[in-house]
Amino acid sequence: MVSMILAAAFWVVLHFVAAGPLRPRVAARLGEQGFRGVFSLLSAAGLAWLILAYRVAPYVTLWQAVPGAAYIAMPLMFVAFLLLAFGIGAGNPTLAGADMLLKDQLPIRGITRITRHPALWAFALWALAHLLANGDLAGVLLFGAILVTALNGMVSIDRKRHRALGQGWEAFAAQTSRLPFAAILAGRNTLHVEELPPWRAAVGTALFALALWLHGVIGVSPIPS
């Protein structure tokens, strides 16, 4: 369990440091591309450590499984995969390296109308779904670490973009929201379903089906019985 605790701590500290006041100084020495490269390598190593430590960690019960958790986790997982499919590569200035999208025009369309952080919400919902279904210490460390860094990532990205882009970011943020559907419900934007490509919905659904199949392969079925 020591390795699991250290892996979770490394993951959280890495992401908080990368989003904190040390980032500009490190990026100044390595260059922005160099910083992103090092951070990506460390993140990959941290994720591998988390997974390997989780697989060998002893099962320590913290609480019994939440009654009906599977009925909550399944829809959360489906939404998470849809957000991931719609968010990745969809032209969002909150993604790494996409700052220049705000230079020409506000890219407020599609999933960005719903939330400006679709991919991070995908990871957050994925982690939350697994927290509901797992009440053991190793599960809480793994999924809790991912949930915390995903939620903190939204805040830190917004702050970084605001510092870098100023009024361009303020105009973008005024018409979008961190919380899904908040800008639409507040009347700051409108939902246009026709801007959500059906093929992305198909990809999200396929990923969800693949995840269900993989759970069966490892002997852990998420389907309510």
Set out the residue ranges of the language-model regions.
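Loop-to-transmembrane boundary segments
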Residues: 107-119, 183-205
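Portal/gating segments that form or line small-molecule/metal binding sites
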Residues: 41-112, 116
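Juxtamembrane boundary at the C-terminal end of a transmembrane helix
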Residues: 210-225
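Membrane-proximal soluble regions of multi-pass membrane proteins
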Residues: 159-196
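Membrane-interface helix-loop junction between the first two transmembrane segments
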Residues: 16-35
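A contiguous pocket-lining binding segment that forms or flanks enzyme active sites
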Residues: 112-167
